[in-house]
Amino acid sequence: MTSSVSLSICGDVERPVRLAAAELRSLMDAELVADFHCREGWSRFDERWRGVRLRTLLAYAGAADDAGYVTVGSGEYTAVLTRAQADDDRVLLALDHEGAESPRPSGFPRLVGPAEWDCFLSVKSVDRIEVTRQPQQATAETIALARLER
């Protein structure tokens, strides 16, 4: 992951933060092995990811307990998770894939989760996490489906 990575955590948090790549790495606390199923009809099995649990990042910024939604974004691409989804042990911001540090051009940091997730929730090149009391506008599914129609 390159030094140009910068992730902001904002919204209903005690301490809005901006984390650089080295700071994200220092928080790494999880590994996930999960299948990935794309709506295009292909799958990858037993993908190994290492990174920071999303709930760890939320705690680091002091996310409000009554904020029920987490928006994860990369530019105009946004996925909205419920707080329960975000707090799941299997949801992380991946920094490594298959044992190798992954650079930003490959989509890192990347939101990854359990195999039952819709593929469009796997946001690549995450640049912000926003904690809110009300759900924000999610664009992930619309953008992903438009790409499939090409």
Regions found by a protein language model. Give the residues of each.
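Extended, aromatic/histidine-rich regions of cofactor-dependent oxidoreductases associated
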Residues: M1-D29, Y60-R150
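Solvent-exposed edge beta-strands and adjacent loop segments
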Residues: R25-R39
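Mid-length scaffold segments of soluble, non-membrane domains
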Residues: H37-Y77
